[in-house]
A protein has these predicted regions:
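Membrane-embedded transmembrane helical bundles of large multi-pass transporters/channels
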Residues: 1-79, 209-415
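Structured non-transmembrane domains adjacent to transmembrane bundles in polytopic membrane proteins
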Residues: 74, 79-287, 370
Length: 415
């Protein structure tokens, strides 16, 4: 937000002042590029060709976009782990060796935190009796290796702490304070698996009936909570973003159809990138070439990619629609307006897209999986948006809608 706000303020204040000060000198030290000054009507000719047979172009393009996006229906999400690092990284190799050779010492641990009421003495046989039942239930859960803690042994509390066995006394002294106690549950399931998520849910079910507040922590618990949070908030966020976007586009072109079409087109380009990152990073299509281990996508990848890619797509869309709308106001001819608008904005959008693709493609060679996948997804989203969507889907769809593109419900007035 701050970066966009800063760029906006710069473009409205400092940039015009600099351009005014430099004047014609802005063209000094130009780099001679062959054919740079040659005028071309490529975008006008191509869009006119598309609009002569809009259905023939639109249906295959839409089918391709839907096909590219369909793998996202099988997406798997995770909070990440050591698999996010390159297979040849020393730290990952060391951990994998330890897991293979000493599984008991590298078992995944789910910490349980018992929060005591103010003034409540944790050294209580009553609390231990209740916790014994809970601990026994947790031990029966599939995937639990062990759960050992003196707070689960009410028989110890008939004696003084000094009389306890050394192991129990040391564990009590290092994991219990006046306000909380921590119990480690060793499990065979690592984070990022369906089994680990089910294990967390089963543990929480066992602790629900306790008179004490018992919190289930750990990386797997964080993953379960993040997925739940995202599933709860994403519908609201999507609704807000899409509605606000349509309102802003409507304020620019005063049309109902065009904003809806703009949002749908951008969703198609973003969904195509979502589908391809599933094929590449989850299914492992380019795992050898890009040096990574196929795995579920990081939880943060889809929200981040959607936010950035949708914003860029709308930026290109608004730029193009503003030119088309200007031509429509001048000519009243929808087909001519579309071809004129694409010709006026096509080169600018293509150049901007090429720059963004080059920038995002550099992220693909990063070592960390989340950066690699985000860079790939954004590069694909921009490429699809600047080619299939802008060159084919938009002109063919607007040609089919005709003058209905510019209808507005403002008392039946034309946009």
């Amino acid at each position: 937000f701050l970066a966009v706000l800063g760029a906006l303020m710069y473009s409205l204040t400092l940039l015009p002042a600099l351009l005014s000060y430099l004047g014609p000198r802005i063209n000094s030290l130009r780099v001679p590029i062959p054919g740079a000054n040659r005028k071309t009507r490529f975008w006008e000719k191509f869009s006119t060709k598309v609009m002569k047979n809009p259905v023939r172009w639109l249906l295959p393009a839409m089918a391709l976009l839907l096909l590219l996006g369909s793998p996202f229906l099988n997406v798997q999400l995770t909070a990440g782990g050591v698999e996010a690092l390159p297979p040849d990284l020393e730290s990952r190799q060391a951990l994998e060796i330890l897991e293979d050779e000493f599984p008991a010492f590298t078992a995944s641990v789910v910490p349980l935190v018992i929060v005591f009421d103010d003034g409540q003495d944790p050294y209580s046989q009553e609390i231990a009796s209740e916790m014994e039942t809970i601990c026994e239930g947790i031990r029966e859960i599939q995937g639990v290796i062990s759960l050992e803690h003196p707070i689960c042994k009410p028989g110890l509390f008939v004696t003084e702490l000094e009389e306890w066995p050394d192991n129990d006394r040391l564990l009590w002294q290092t994991t219990v304070s006046q306000n909380i106690a921590m119990i480690d549950v060793a499990t065979i399931f690592g984070s990022g698996t369906d089994e680990s998520e089910q294990l967390i849910k089963d543990i929480r079910t066992q602790t629900e009936g306790s008179t004490q507040e018992i919190l289930v922590g750990g990386w797997s618990s964080f993953e379960v909570d993040m997925k739940q949070h995202l599933s709860d908030r994403i519908p609201f966020v999507l609704t807000f973003v899409l509605l606000l976007t349509m309102v802003l586009v409507w304020m620019q072109v005063r049309s109902i159809v065009v904003p809806v079409k703009a949002v749908l087109m951008n969703i198609l380009s973003v969904s195509a990138s979502f589908g391809l990152i599933v094929v590449v990073f989850q299914e492992g299509l380019l795992s050898d070439a890009l040096n990574f281990t196929p795995q579920p996508l990081d939880l943060m990848v889809p929200p981040l990619v959607f936010g950035i890619a949708f914003g860029l797509s709308m930026d290109y869309e608004v730029l193009m629609l503003s030119r088309i709308h200007e031509a429509w106001n001048e000519t009243g001819d929808n087909t001519l307006a579309v071809s004129t608008g694409l010709q006026a904005s096509g080169s600018l959008i293509t150049g901007a897209a090429a720059i963004m693709i080059a920038v995002f493609s550099g992220f693909i060679f990063a070592d960390v999986m989340i950066i690699k996948s985000i860079g790939f997804a954004l590069a694909i989203a921009v490429f699809v948006d600047a080619t299939i969507v802008r060159a084919i889907v938009v002109p063919s769809a607007m040609r089919l809608m005709g003058k209905a593109n510019w209808w507005s419900p403002n008392f039946g007035k034309k946009a």
